[in-house]
């Protein structure tokens, strides 16, 4: 997926590229000690679900059918792309997921093509939480979003997963994941990378129709 790319040449203001720092391997790192890793990376079926759930939700918002918000409803969009899966984004996301640095964003995940955004979700239980339930955690942040305010330093922590999900100009997605047992719980950890990135402070996630 990323053969022949020298990620050490891809610069980010915030630091060294994940694949430059950790290498191409997606094998779980020493940090994962104590966790019984059941599987690394989404299945083909899960990849389809990730894309279809994102596009279902993006279309719902674009059509003006999302009634939640602070205040709701969310305005319809005139520039909402449908997302497609990108293996390079997924590979970079998986290298980072396999480091077991939980709920922390990596410093640099860009590709030669564009800057890359990121959403992270995690859930555990006696049954394995499915991938769509993780994505819905991001969608649910819409309840706190005021479209007219856009993205600010103050609200970013509460709404940033939602706004990246519905960033109109984003076109591609690729995700990494780990499923593992710990303390008798089945855990599902998901990292999705988005290109081109969204979530610029002071900007609106999409153009109002």
UniProtKB/Swiss-Prot annotation:
Report the leader peptide range.
Answer: 1-4
SMART domains from the UniProt entry = SCP
Q: Where in the cell is it found?
A: Secreted
* Disulphide bridges: 8-20, 12-108, 32-100, 175-192
Pfam families, per database record: CAP
User: For this UniProt entry, what is the primary localization, expressed as one broad class?
Assistant: secreted
Give the source's domain of life in one word. Eukaryota
Keyword Disulfide bond appears in the UniProt entry: yes
Domain SCP residues, every copy: 52-194
Q: Which keywords does this chain's UniProt record carry?
A: Allergen, Disulfide bond, Secreted, Signal
Cellular-component GO terms for this entry: extracellular region
Cite the record's tissue specificity text. Answer: Expressed by the venom gland.
The record, for CDD domains, names: CAP_euk
Quote the InterPro entries the UniProt record gives: Allrgn_V5/Tpx1_CS (IPR018244), CAP_dom (IPR014044), CAP_sf (IPR035940), CRISP-related (IPR001283), V5_allergen-like (IPR002413)
Family the UniProt entry places it in: Belongs to the CRISP family. Venom allergen 5-like subfamily.
Mind telling me what this protein is named? Venom allergen 5
Say which species the protein is native to. Polistes annularis
